[in-house]
Design a protein with these regions (language model features):
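Metal-dependent de-N-acetylase/amidase catalytic core
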Residues: 1-4, 78-229
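Active-site rim/loop-helix segments in enzyme catalytic domains that contact anionic ligands
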Residues: 1-93, 221
């Protein structure tokens, strides 16, 4: 299975859903990270440094990573043209699952813009008549999920036990040395994961939000209860 994880900036994917991706890599799935900027507007770290930090983190995750140029950090625009560019990458990689930042407004506008672009791109990727995408065969994404970078969204639709991956996740986040030396971002993420874990009776957990209803063949797939306490 191919899984495409998309972030607006270097470190979004790593802080938002890296443990989930590590689990998938260990299951033998192919993971590609697609980053829409190099953090050009940030106060810490140059674009070159931040790109290298992402590449280092991707190696720990076991994923490939690529960067797209959308005029830089803080200049990501919600336009059909930008969604089409992302859709072309979807046709190229052919993911069955896509994960992206939640489109709900939060503290950085690029996160919500990225989520909206990816949502549209998933639709565009399956449209056969789009001349802008004619160079690649039509592809239908199976499911789109959104991850949360901050901790103030509503309760996630899917909660995944990541208790056995905390040290690996911390190592991935520490790859972004330029971003974690002055603020306790890692502790913030771990605290959020700990609180989410309490809701399912595990030490740590990560959440995903659905874009569409999740299709099942049988409810026995849901036999694992979150009520372990």
């Amino acid at each position: 299975m191919n899984i495409l994880a998309i972030g607006a900036h270097p470190d979004d994917i790593e802080f938002g859903c890296a443990p989930i991706l590590i689990k998938e890599v260990r299951q033998g799935n192919q993971v590609r990270m697609l980053v829409l900027s190099r953090g050009e507007a940030g106060s810490a770290g140059t674009p070159e440094v931040r790109e290298e930090e992402s590449r280092k983190a991707a190696r720990l995750i076991g994923a490939a990573v690529d960067f797209m140029d959308f005029e830089g950090d803080c200049h990501l625009e919600y336009t059909p043209e930008n969604a089409l560019r992302i859709a072309l990458e979807m046709r190229r990689f052919k993911p069955q699952i896509v994960v992206a930042p939640h489109p709900q407004e939060n503290q950085h506008p690029d996160h919500s813009v990225a989520g909206k672009l990816v949502r549209d791109a998933c639709r565009f990727a399956r449209y056969g008549g789009l001349v802008e995408l004619k160079s690649m065969a039509v592809h239908r994404v199976g499911n789109l999920f959104f991850y949360n970078i901050t901790q103030h969204l509503q309760k996630p639709d899917i909660v995944i036990d990541i208790s056995d991956l905390i040290s690996e996740w911390e190592a991935v986040m520490n790859c972004h040395e330029s971003q974690v030396t002055s603020k306790s971002y890692i502790e913030l993420q771990k605290t959020g994961a700990r609180l989410l874990g309490l809701t399912i009776g595990t030490e740590y957990a990560a959440g995903l939000f659905t874009n569409d209803p999740v299709r099942l063949e049988t409810i026995s797939d849901l036999a694992l209860s979150s009520r372990n306490f």
